[in-house]
Regions:
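Vicinal oxygen chelate
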Residues: 2, 89-129
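Conserved beta-strand in the GNAT
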Residues: 56-58, 126
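Short, charged/polar surface micro-motifs in flexible loops or helix N-caps
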Residues: 50-54, 62-63, 85
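Exposed loop/turn and edge beta-strand positions of beta-sandwich/beta-sheet ligand-binding modules
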Residues: 5, 41-43, 74, 111
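A short, acidic/glycine-rich surface segment
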Residues: 32-33, 42, 62-68, 101-102, ...
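Core segments of cupin and vicinal oxygen chelate
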Residues: 11-54
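N-terminal beta-strand motif that seeds the catalytic metal site of vicinal oxygen chelate
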Residues: 1-18, 75-78
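Mid-chain, well-packed structural core segment of small domains
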Residues: 71, 78-86
Length: 129
């Protein structure tokens, strides 16, 4: 077997309207499908960016809270590539999305700027040049 790509990433959120507004209206993801699953008491949004990254969001009432510190095993954050972190920060801020400070990724002498921001349920998101 040979793995060829990451097909999608799945996260859990609690509020449909806030999640839809954040990922679709503010970040520009396209909706692939949006279905309610009454038997599971949830809703599933499958979203995609132009370059093929798919994000599957399960929206359910009162999901377990994301543990931030001490860090837990599992998904730590999602990172998206951008051409310019400072320009991306301006773009996010113009849409009402707060960001953290610009940090420098010094791993392996990369020395590229990164910034974190959070989705409506606190999932850490990173922008990386």
């Amino acid at each position: 077997m040979k793995l060829t790509s990451v097909h999608h990433i799945a996260v859990i959120n609690s509020d449909y309207e806030k999640t839809y507004d954040f990922y679709v209206n503010k970040l520009g993801f396209n909706v692939i499908f949006d279905i309610e699953r009454p038997a599971k008491n949830d809703r599933v949004l499958m979203l995609e960016l132009d370059k093929g990254l798919m994000l599957e969001i399960f929206i359910m009432p009162e999901p377990p809270v994301h543990q931030d510190a001490p860090e837990a095993a599992g998904l730590r954050h999602l990172a998206f590539g951008v051409e310019s972190v400072p320009e991306a920060i301006k773009w996010l801020n113009s849409r009402g999305i707060e960001t953290g400070p610009i940090l420098m990724d010094t791993n392996n002498n990369i020395n590229k700027p990164v910034v974190f921001f959070w989705d409506p349920d606190g999932t850490p998101l990173e922008l990386h040049e």
